[in-house]
Swiss-Prot record:
<feature type="disulfide bond">
    <location>
        <begin position="21"/>
        <end position="36"/>
    </location>
</feature>
<keyword id="KW-0208">D-amino acid</keyword>
<feature type="disulfide bond">
    <location>
        <begin position="18"/>
        <end position="27"/>
    </location>
</feature>
<dbReference type="GO" id="GO:0090729">
    <property type="term" value="F:toxin activity"/>
</dbReference>
<comment type="function">
    <text>Iota-conotoxins bind to voltage-gated sodium channels (Nav) and act as agonists by shifting the voltage-dependence of activation to more hyperpolarized levels. Produces general excitatory symptoms.</text>
</comment>
<feature type="propeptide" description="Removed by a carboxypeptidase">
    <location>
        <position position="44"/>
    </location>
</feature>
<feature type="disulfide bond">
    <location>
        <begin position="5"/>
        <end position="19"/>
    </location>
</feature>
<protein>
    <recommendedName>
        <fullName>Iota-conotoxin-like Fi11.1</fullName>
    </recommendedName>
</protein>
<keyword id="KW-0528">Neurotoxin</keyword>
<keyword id="KW-1015">Disulfide bond</keyword>
<dbReference type="GO" id="GO:0017080">
    <property type="term" value="F:sodium channel regulator activity"/>
</dbReference>
<keyword id="KW-0872">Ion channel impairing toxin</keyword>
<feature type="modified residue" description="D-leucine">
    <location>
        <position position="42"/>
    </location>
</feature>
<comment type="similarity">
    <text>Belongs to the conotoxin I1 superfamily.</text>
</comment>
<keyword id="KW-0800">Toxin</keyword>
<dbReference type="Pfam" id="PF08088">
    <property type="entry name" value="Toxin_19"/>
</dbReference>
<keyword id="KW-0738">Voltage-gated sodium channel impairing toxin</keyword>
């Protein structure tokens, strides 16, 4: 499933205004790559 994130708690998807999902389900702000192990973003 999706990972809740962001100030509004929306589900993590490709939405840049929400967040980027990195491999492993790690969710980070769309403006930060810190903590991401890969540049391949997942939708689920």
């Amino acid at each position: 499933g999706h990972v809740s994130c962001g100030k509004d708690g929306r589900a993590c998807d490709y939405h840049a205004d929400c967040c980027n999902c990195c491999l492993g389900g790690i969710c980070k702000p769309s403006t930060s790559w810190i903590g991401c192990s890969t540049n391949v973003f997942l939708t689920r």
